[in-house]
Amino acid sequence: MSTDNKRLLIDIGSTYFKVSSKDSLEQHFRDFNKRILDDLTHKCGDTLKRFTPEDIQICSSANGGLSTLIIGVTHSYSLKYATNIAYNSGINIIDSIVFQDIEDYSIPSDLIDVVIIVGGINSNGGLFDERLDSYLGKLNYSNLVYVGNAPDAKTLSSRLDKLVVLPNVVDDRLHIVEEHLKDYLTNLYQEDIEGKEDIKHLYEITANQIFPTPYVVGQSLPIMHSAFSVTDPFILLDIGGATTDVHYSKDLVNDNIVTEQGHDRIVFKKLGVYKSRQSLIFTAENNEFAYELLMHLKVTENIYNEHSEKATKVLMQLAIFLVLCKMSSYRPSYITLKLLSINSIVFTGGISKVLNVEDIEDIVAFFYRKILNSDHKPVTVLDSNYDIWTLGAKEHASCQ
């Protein structure tokens, strides 16, 4: 096994790529007129030559991540467990469907990378009738996996083509079983990367598996205190060009799931300032407090039409506000966090190159005053040198 001194860590993002070695950390804007490998070689060729393929570890979010639709029996167990596993595997969830109401749900128009079917403990069967077959027949999807009760596994296997059957994510004591679905989704991400023409060429320089960036960042959370002055419970906001990832202490949710990890993840897929710029603006325009925030920042809605450093800064500040709204009782999404219990908020990703601590604290204070009617002030920690990613990448690589 290589030591950290002999290892090169690379992260390929939607907008930037980063290269970290013992001696330095490089960050470069991607040139979208070139293949990723060609761009990487052009800008970091001398560094790459110093390492063997066995000593180069790569993670990536440049393929946009995998999308999943989850069909389950109840929100209490099956849907909740499958959603938790998917998010913590670096998968983007587009919707969760309660099977008994499946006829009330619209059909997504986009291609879905994987559909997950889940529900029931192994002593119960007969939970999925022909309505499931009818709904799936209208979907455009690439993979279908079943992680529900054992009796229905046999029935559905005979009815649904190319169904992958894995052990139930709900055991007989209603506890979560993570391993099998998590491994499946991680491997599916790997296959997706290998199928992406622009990313699979990266295997010319590495002999190691390429993992999802959010998964790698998640490896840093248990050891975050070794590099940062962070007090539990905390949240980590990774705000970039295409998405915003949030990693949070489980103490911040009421309905906690007992798993091996002390932190969970949620992703807001279309909340970024470059590739997801228009989606971010649309979300802001539909938030009744965004206009007031713009006034607080002494700008108007005309800033949405500008392409300047100032506009990028304002959009980053809006992203902070909007994602906090989405995790609050004001605009609840998948989870509602106990934001008044947070002691630290850690920021990483592209945001660290645009905003300083004062810029961030201004928005956090505005959110707490306006939305939560509170003077609560969590400590802001800004990862200005991507040390969190480096920490997670080293931890992940040491386990390989």
Language-model-detected regions and their locations in the chain:
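Nucleotide/phosphate-binding catalytic cleft detector across ATP-hydrolyzing
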Residues: 1-9, 24, 31-34, 39-233, ...
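Short glycine-rich, Thr/Ser-proximal phosphate-binding strand/loop in the N-terminal lobe
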Residues: 14-39, 80, 88-95, 257-279
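A structural-propensity feature for long, helix-poor, extended segments
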Residues: 110-113, 272-306, 310
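Adenine-nucleotide phosphate-binding core of ATP-dependent small-molecule kinases
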Residues: 206-213, 301-332
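Conserved helix-loop functional segments at active or binding sites
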Residues: 222-227, 252, 326-329
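Glycine-rich phosphate-binding loop of actin/hexokinase-like ATP-binding domains
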Residues: 232-291, 356-375
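Long, contiguous domain-sized segments
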Residues: 241, 290-306, 385-400
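Hard-cation-handling environments
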Residues: 242, 248, 321-322, 326-344
